Amino acid sequence: MKKIKWLAFLLFFTGLPQQVDANANDKIVCEAKHSLYHGQFAIKATYRFIMNDNSGVILINGTAHLGPERYAISREVYFNYKRQSGDDYLLTSQRVYTNPIDTLPELLAQQHYPSFFLKENKKLNFLINSVNQTDYIISFVSTPLFYCNGE
């Protein structure tokens, strides 16, 4: 019985905290190119995800087209996240910074982006599956949205 207690003690104080700590401090740094088409409207952008220690930022840079009109997109979405279980992450936007070169009208942004990308204190769930040590598939609901290439 003493051996079992000693083994449990060793496993708990050496192995388990490392596993818990690894889940709490997921570090993800990757970049995805994404195109979105809604009728005559199109967005082509690069999304850079930087996540570590329950906070992160998504840097968005690209262009949007509506007929002959062309708009620049340049935004930074700062957020906190919580790993709910497995690969399920709940993100909460903290600050959304629109860079001066961003010319996308707010109405068009609202029509084509979830509010998480536009306003503070908005929530969004992502499934983030590791493909290998650096790359990830990021899904919204059950639809893969980004293949994110790591560094």
Task: Give the ranges of each region predicted by the language model.
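Hydrophobic membrane-insertion alpha-helices, especially the h-region
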Residues: 2-21
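Extracytoplasmic/periplasmic/luminal assembly and interaction segments
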Residues: 44-89
